Amino acid sequence: MAVFPMFIELENEICLIIGGGKVALRKAEVLLDMGAEVHVISREFESELEQCQSPGRLECHAVDGGPLAAAVWLEQNARKEGIGNVAMLICATDDERINDQMVLWARKNRIPANSATNPADCDFYFPSVVRRGNLMVGVSTGGGTPALSR
């Protein structure tokens, strides 16, 4: 797969994260650092995610149910929760079935998706980032060996 390296403006953009564990926490921290509005949808949440909640910045939404629970919740509640015009979806669960279903949901809704369990399903990757003042460098292995890019 050929990927194009690019930087996008995320200030005040809505980003969804499915899953509330350590991977979700790391992704949320990166997105919040870029000024995004982050909504985390999960059955359970790392305590740090819940403690950092702030309306319009980081919001955690609890769901119950099987692999389609997050997609069903989004279909039923997105508008009333103020979640529209989603910039990206990050599937950060450790359940490949849930991540696969959410990638399908994202594609149906024309939302770029990233999957923690299947790099081949990713529309984009999170690079390792080095910042020095106004200089920002992103290094990626295209999801192949993320530890190598650190």
For each feature predicted by the language model, list its residue ranges.
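Hydrophobic, well-ordered beta-alpha structural blocks that scaffold small-molecule cofactor pockets
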Residues: M1-E44, L49-C52
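Structural motif
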Residues: I14, A87-M88
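Residue-level detector of alpha-helix initiation sites
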Residues: K22-V23, E96-R97, G143
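Hydrophobic beta-strand scaffold residues
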Residues: V38, W73, R110-A113
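Glycine-rich, highly charged phosphate/nucleotide-binding loops
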Residues: G56-L58, A62-I83
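Short glycine-/small-residue-rich Rossmann-like dinucleotide-binding loops
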Residues: N77, T93-D94, T141
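ADP-ribose/adenylate-binding Rossmann-like module
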Residues: M88-D94, N99-Y125
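An accessory alpha-helical subdomain
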Residues: G143-R150
